[in-house]
From Swiss-Prot:
Name of the protein in its database record: Translation initiation factor IF-2
KW GTP-binding (keyword) present: yes
Lineage: Bacteria, Pseudomonadati, Pseudomonadota, Gammaproteobacteria, Enterobacterales
Organism, as annotated: Escherichia fergusonii (strain ATCC 35469 / DSM 13698 / CCUG 18766 / IAM 14443 / JCM 21226 / LMG 7866 / NBRC 102419 / NCTC 12128 / CDC 0568-73)
Main location: cytoplasm
Compositional bias segments (type: Polar residues): 67-81
Region (Disordered) location: 45-304
Amino acid sequence: MTDVTIKTLAAERQTSVERLVQQFADAGIRKSADDSVSAQEKQTLIDHLNQKNSGPDKLTLQRKTRSTLNIPGTGGKSKSVQIEVRKKRTFVKRDPQEAERLAAEEQAQREAEEQARREAEESAKREAQQKAEREAAEQAKREAAEQAKREAAEKDKVSNQQDDMTKNAQAEKARREQEAAELKRKAEEEARRKLEEEARRVAEEARRMAEENKWTDNAEPTEDSSDYHVTTSQHARQAEDESDREVEGGRGRGRNAKAARPKKGNKHSESKADREEARAAVRGGKGGKRKGSSLQQGFQKPAQAVNRDVVIGETITVGELANKMAVKGSQVIKAMMKLGAMATINQVIDQETAQLVAEEMGHKVILRRENELEEAVMSDRDTGAAAEPRAPVVTIMGHVDHGKTSLLDYIRSTKVASGEAGGITQHIGAYHVETENGMITFLDTPGHAAFTSMRARGAQATDIVVLVVAADDGVMPQTIEAIQHAKAAGVPVVVAVNKIDKPEADPDRVKNELSQYGILPEEWGGESQFVHVSAKAGTGIDELLDAILLQAEVLELKAVRKGMASGAVIESFLDKGRGPVATVLVREGTLHKGDIVLCGFEYGRVRAMRNEMGQEVLEAGPSIPVEILGLSGVPAAGDEVTVVRDEKKAREVALYRQGKFREVKLARQQKSKLENMFANMTEGEVHEVNIVLKADVQGSVEAISDSLLKLSTDEVKVKIIGSGVGGITETDATLAAASNAILVGFNVRADASARKVIEAESLDLRYYSVIYNLIDEVKAAMSGMLSPELKQQIIGLAEVRDVFKSPKFGAIAGCMVTEGVVKRHNPIRVLRDNVVIYEGELESLRRFKDDVNEVRNGMECGIGVKNYNDVRTGDVIEVFEIIEIQRTIA
């Protein structure tokens, strides 16, 4: 046969070249794809494959035996029980060499066992023969001794009977010899029978041990048998034992089986442990072997704690957390108590608390983000457009009445400041101004202390902060706060020193004061530009605009003009005719009329857009503030505004945010710490002022709520029962009536239905347009709830000149009033060497012999002190009264 290549052989065998090369390598032949293969190498490969693909290495045999057992019952009735015994044996094929070795070992073992058995039988025979011989010799000795005794006794008899006795003795001797021979024969037979039984027993034991060694040591075949018994009583278990012995050993019910069977009357004599052992023996053991050990629990306690990966969402109940850690809920509650938090098993806890508890208990925490839908919606946007320069967003900040809005009015050439209630700004105004050098967007923030959050929001949404400081007033508290907001937001500051036209203006003082807070002018080596302006005369306005544009040019402000818009809510309110209205500052992209927007918890389609002049616009680019209509509700000021593609997904995200906010809020409200519990217990009675607040815009609601809550003291607390944007409705009036609250309207009015409820319930309704007045009146209401302060006021002093004894009043002090007036029934103190030794009240006050109500300065009188007789000459009696002083909220 000619040699062929690997490729040709692979094509003939219909296999791949790589597999064929691997098969040759397994057979011990190294080949490559282009090598030739000889006939001998082919045969070697075929032998290798045949040997590899030989028959199965394991054979399993199963056997099932069924039997029926009749059990006698009460009343003469018998009960049939079906018994089924299942057995399974597995035979493992071995290698020929291993099989030969095991066969040789088995043959050697069998020979050794046979030799041991023969030696045991011979030894048993020898022992039995020696024993029989010893017993026969002893018997003969005893008989000889008895014969000798009888012969001696016979000699004493009468001589005439000697012949007869001799004959009888000879006959008796013959008979005894015959009996001795018979006894010897029986003893030999008994010894031989015992020897045979002993030999059989030893042989049986040796054979059984050999079989056990063969099945346990050689491991061929391996046997895995399991018995499944259906038992109903102790009789059934006994029958199962007998059936197992018949099936496994092939032996009948012999004497041993009968001996093993208990007697009928013995059923109750067995102890509980014996019955448990018998039951365990019936059911236990591989290969049908019975074990006498009692039942044992198979579970063992883990050697160390199991650390798990616990996945925690934004909120989770205590019970769910315990299930994730595979522990009891009580253990989680104990761990939370150690951390200082009280909770029940069904209470919702936030993610941070759950993480602390899980890590405290030694588990690894995986925080799960549940806002995949929100991320998917927010990431589905038009991106990739080139960034273009945009107009700067400038926030005007400063102290109240320093001229921020007036300065902006001059720039816009309008009269906005005169329209504000009280002449102070209470909203964020957003405007954009076209100048010769470009467009600028201005945000005008309030300067009053109550509007801290508005100023912070304005600083976050801005590029440049213009800090307005009055030259005649200098740095004030809100000026410092504006500097802090600007530094926190990381935006540059341009200082406008206003009211420079006033005679008392001092710009250098402003520079010195601002330098203490890190605002240094450029001429002093700092980074802030200082511009002197006058909002009234218009001086320095152009320089201020140039400084703003110069700062914007340094910042290189850019934004993507094309694509889907995003921005922030500057202000929001509820218009009675138009619905929810939000002032939005666009940051990037272009906002079109008809776009679908997602804004915090609200969503909707933009139905209309207006600029700050009230004119309709169709689109708004970066840095342009517009009012949008069409949202599902009033958004919170500061919320992100994003244009999305799908209104359905926007609705789902908004609803998800609402539900998640509610869950997180509930979890935080329920979190009760031990120290808070004890503080509430010791707090005692606290008066509350309940308020239902309605305002025109969201920012005002936020500012007023913060200001009112800060008024709370340890004795009087302010609770905002309800708040919202828009007019006062019937629902608000009903809520105020139910909670005994004050209705407060800030720049809003109550409708007709609400007024009817207010009149019927006699509710306290108050309207305000300036935040100063609102806060002052709430302070007055809280002051009326404060308990008055008690103050002791000394009204007179009397010096003891002499002491008299009275049978009715005891010791009477004769006194001279040295100061003020002494009144009867007023509390007094007795002073000795300027030390108070007694405090009580006057019982008797007399001038001469007449009782009087009061004695004035310079007059003598007799004073009887109630329940006190230790009055001495030289003591001073101090008379005082307690007056109430009404407290006020600071």
